[in-house]
Amino acid sequence: MSIVENILSLRERFTAKLQKANIFDNFFMRVVLENKEVCQYVLRKLLKKPDIIVLDCKTEVQISKLFGKDSRLDVLATDKTGKIFNIEIQKAKEDAHELRVRYYHSAVDSEIIRKGKEYSDLPPVYVIYVSKTDIWEKGSAVYMVEKSLKYHGKADIYDDKQYTLYVNAEVKDNSEQDISALMEYFKICNPDDDTHGALSEYVRYLKTDKKGNDIMYDEFEREFEGDIRKRTKADDIAKIMLDFKVSFERALKTLDIPEEEHDDYAELLRYFYPNVMQ
């Protein structure tokens, strides 16, 4: 698809995509789960802790570099007791899940220490790894990691305040009906389904209300912000050409536009400013 087609069809594509959008779509997830009431509802359901009170919730959190690698967490929340919750939504088929979770724990701890906390003050951190498929292939919707301290053939609970929960949307688990129902909703996000409290309310608002649609369109545009930025820059090129009566090439040079982008701008100006490009 050309850059012009990309820009012209953006609203049309958005309308179709929004109706099918679910929590496994990044542009939808980052809006839905940043809502504090929604985040609280989801955490209470997944952790079976109805008393969680979320004070702060952010999505796509960029944190300081860890071992030279940029770290971005899908959802990072804090409750009133100081506990930290990291929810990671895995859509694609990946491997080394346990190493990914180890990295998420390290990233969160690294950020806490960077902000001046002592080791003894490290709060409990929960990493909740949500996947579309049953990555462990054991037929369960939920997997809880428990650490133990082994000695003389015995084993005691080893509590380092790092907790890991794996949840998947593939298995319909009769022993985890509430979580399975939530995962089913994650996959569909039907605005007519009102069975999931704050989550259902916000999804319905985003999908059916004009103001909610506008919020989602702004988020959807982020995925195409490079093309949209070029569209704005094309206006600048045309203005320079008209005001100063210079060539297309001269306008590009004035704005210091890289040579590899020249064809895109030529296409944009031919479409939006055909008289200028004659």
Predicted regions span which residues?
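Extended serine/threonine-enriched, polar tracts that run as long, contiguous segments within proteins
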Residues: 168-170, 174
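Short, charged alpha-helical interaction segments and adjacent helix-coil junctions
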Residues: 2-23, 27, 78-81, 85-90, ...
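Low-complexity, glycine/alanine/valine/leucine- and proline-rich hydrophobic stretches
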Residues: 151-161, 165, 178, 182-189
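Accessory alpha/beta interaction modules
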Residues: 1-163, 173, 278
